[in-house]
């Protein structure tokens, strides 16, 4: 068997439906749209959910619930283990982005307590977990919380 002998299985390649190309094609004259009416016209389709002027189901059913997702603040999580070996005394967002610990778009930085810290750092961040705060203060470091601006 040669490569030029290979053919697709029967029925695997469906022919494109060519409309308006003669009566014998089966899709001539009205091109499968029927006779007249809104759906036969160009651009003539009703919007989704339209029920002919009757009050649509989506508007008949009452609204329920709410969410505050719009107001949620997404912090970039930074563990203490990721900060081992940093030479600078002050750790802020610009430094964390520069060394590649924080990437992407976030509303702020949150320091988490996974890992240990030995050097005394000054953190200028938006939030700190309780375990991280304890470990930072134990190592002699300070935390300056920044108010996040939406």
From Swiss-Prot:
Assembly: Part of the 50S ribosomal subunit.
The species this protein was found in: Methylacidiphilum infernorum (isolate V4)
Keyword set, alphabetical order: Ribonucleoprotein, Ribosomal protein, RNA-binding, rRNA-binding
InterPro entries assigned: Ribosomal_uL15, Ribosomal_uL15/eL18, Ribosomal_uL15/eL18_sf, Ribosomal_uL15_bac-type
Gene Ontology MF: a single term: rRNA binding
Keyword Ligase: no
Matching Pfam families: Ribosomal_L27A
SUPFAM superfamilies with a match to the protein in the record: Ribosomal proteins L15p and L18e (SSF52080)
Superkingdom as given in the UniProt entry: Bacteria
Keyword check for Phosphoprotein: no
NCBIfam families registered for this protein in UniProt: rplO_bact (TIGR01071)
Protein name: Large ribosomal subunit protein uL15
Gene designation per UniProt: rplO
Basic residues bias: start-end ranges: 30-39
Single GO biological process annotation from the record: translation
GO CC, one annotated term: cytosolic large ribosomal subunit
Function: Binds to the 23S rRNA.
Coiled coil: none
Ranges for region Disordered: 12-43
Family as reported in the entry's similarity comment: Belongs to the universal ribosomal protein uL15 family.
């Amino acid at each position: 068997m040669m490569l030029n002998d290979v053919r697709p299985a029967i029925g695997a390649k469906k022919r494109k439906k060519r409309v308006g190309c003669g009566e014998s094609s089966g899709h001539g004259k009205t091109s499968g749209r029927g006779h007249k009416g809104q759906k036969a016209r160009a651009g003539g389709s009703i919007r989704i959910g339209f029920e002919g002027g009757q009050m649509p189901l989506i508007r008949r059913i009452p609204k329920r619930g709410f969410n505050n997702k719009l107001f949620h603040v997404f912090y970039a999580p930074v563990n203490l283990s990721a900060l081992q070996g940093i030479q600078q005394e002050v750790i802020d967002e610009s430094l964390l982005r520069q060394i590649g610990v924080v990437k992407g778009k976030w509303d702020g930085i949150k320091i988490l307590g996974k890992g240990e810290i030995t050097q005394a750092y000054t953190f200028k961040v938006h939030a700190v977990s309780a375990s991280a705060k304890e470990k930072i203060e134990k190592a002699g470091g300070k935390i300056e919380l920044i108010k996040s601006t939406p």
